[in-house]
Amino acid sequence: MERALILAASAIGAGLAMIAGIGPGIGQGFAAGKGAEAVGKQPEAQGDILRTMLLGAAVAESTGIYALVVALILLFANPLLNLL
């Protein structure tokens, strides 16, 4: 019974952790749109704008990657099961 409860709570926690993937998707879309807008206004600064946009996208994506790691740990290498 306790094991089933821990597994169920872990599955729910993994699902909630994956909700964090929504934020990076929205942020990267917003950054790409603003980057395209900036290149349209100043085509000569395309290299600098692209570099800054890619750095921002990498930082935003790290949140989604951390959420994926937490979800995978909860599902496949659950440390809470060792407490039983």
Swiss-Prot record:
It is a multi-pass membrane protein. InterPro entries: ATP_synth_csu_bac/chlpt, ATP_synth_F0_csu, ATPase_proteolipid_c-like_dom, F/V-ATP_Csub_sf. The record marks I65 as: Reversibly binds sodium during transport. The chain crosses the membrane at residues 6-26, 64-84. CDD domains: ATP-synt_Fo_c_NaATPase. Its main location: membrane. GO terms for cellular component: plasma membrane; proton-transporting ATP synthase complex; proton-transporting two-sector ATPase complex, proton-transporting domain. GO terms for biological process: sodium ion transport. It comes from the Bacteria. Keywords: ATP synthesis, Cell membrane, CF(0), Hydrogen ion transport, Ion transport, Lipid-binding, Membrane, Sodium, Sodium transport, Transmembrane, Transmembrane helix, Transport. Gene3D superfamilies: lithium bound rotor ring of v- atpase. Inhibited by dicyclohexylcarbodiimide; the enzyme is protected from inhibition by Na(+) in a pH-dependent manner. One of its GO terms (molecular function) is proton-transporting ATP synthase activity, rotational mechanism. The ATPase of C.paradoxum is of special interest because it uses sodium ions instead of protons as the physiological coupling ion. Belongs to the ATPase C chain family. F-type ATPases have 2 components, F(1) - the catalytic core - and F(0) - the membrane sodium channel. F(1) has five subunits: alpha(3), beta(3), gamma(1), delta(1), epsilon(1). F(0) has three main subunits: a(1), b(2) and c(11). The alpha and beta chains form an alternating ring which encloses part of the gamma chain. F(1) is attached to F(0) by a central stalk formed by the gamma and epsilon chains, while a peripheral stalk is formed by the delta and b chains. This is ATP synthase subunit c, sodium ion specific. It comes from Clostridium paradoxum. The gene is atpE.
